[in-house]
Design a protein with these regions (language model features):
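Helix-turn-helix DNA-binding elements, focusing on the entry/boundary residues of the two helices
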Residues: 17, 28, 46
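Residues in the helix-turn-helix
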Residues: 19, 30, 59
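DNA major-groove recognition helix of helix-turn-helix/homeodomain DNA-binding modules
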Residues: 44-59
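Recognition helix of helix-turn-helix/homeodomain-like DNA-binding domains
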Residues: 25-39
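Short basic helix-loop element that most often maps to the first helix and adjoining turn
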Residues: 4-23
Length: 65
């Protein structure tokens, strides 16, 4: 299972789901589903999200057994 800290980083950056979605070329619903663990991102999307927050991808996403 892939866990993420998207919501935490959005709070740090005072960013709404809509804004993050726009910056990564996605939809608000996708960001919401990622945050709730309902959807695993593609590598490209995960990389773009990490770029927005200016952190390594592994700071945002972790894999748990």
């Amino acid at each position: 299972m892939i866990k993420n800290r998207i919501k935490e980083y959005r709070a740090i950056f005072d960013m709404k789901q809509e804004e993050l979605a726009r910056l990564v070329g996605g939809r608000r619903e996708t960001i919401g589903n990622l945050e709730k663990g309902r959807y695993n991102p593609s590598l490209a999307l995960a990389w773009r999200i990490a770029q927005v927050f200016k952190v390594p991808i592994e700071d945002v996403f972790t894999v748990e057994d």
